[in-house]
Amino acid sequence: MKIEKFEEKQLEELMLFLDENLNENYERVVFLNIRKRWPEGFLTVIDEGKIVGTCCGAILPNDKLRVLILVLQNDYQKRGIGKDLMDRMIRASEIFGVKKVTLEVRKDSDAITFYRKLGFSSVDVLPCYYQDGCDGIVMEKQL
């Protein structure tokens, strides 16, 4: 298993992976734009030649890193891979002077516990934030 920067040639495989592992639907161009703006902040987890996880983020004004996506196939969860992805993204953001990391997570997601273990706190609720009407929880971590 290896973690590497997302490459444009992986786009079709990434879209299939996300369709299978997320409830949200995104246009392909979104991921190309994310990669273009900050390639070091867009990572994939590859095992046996297949994408089994990914994360991407964006550097925002006011010294913020916003985690846009962090997802792993179920059988790769709870193995430290998500923490490794988050740590790598945060390290890559340090050259921008990032002082705060923000993200949104589904109100009904087990990932809330994961993020709390990483030092994130819930700071807001976004009613009907997700495409299926589920509320989102805004979480933040000070660096």
PLM regions: where:
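Extreme N-terminal starter segment of soluble prokaryotic enzymes
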Residues: M1-I3
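Short coil/turn segments at alpha/beta junctions that flank glycine-rich nucleotide-binding fingerprints
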Residues: R79, F96-K99
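Active-site acidic-Proline motif in GNAT/NAT acetyltransferases
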Residues: Q73-R79, K107-S109
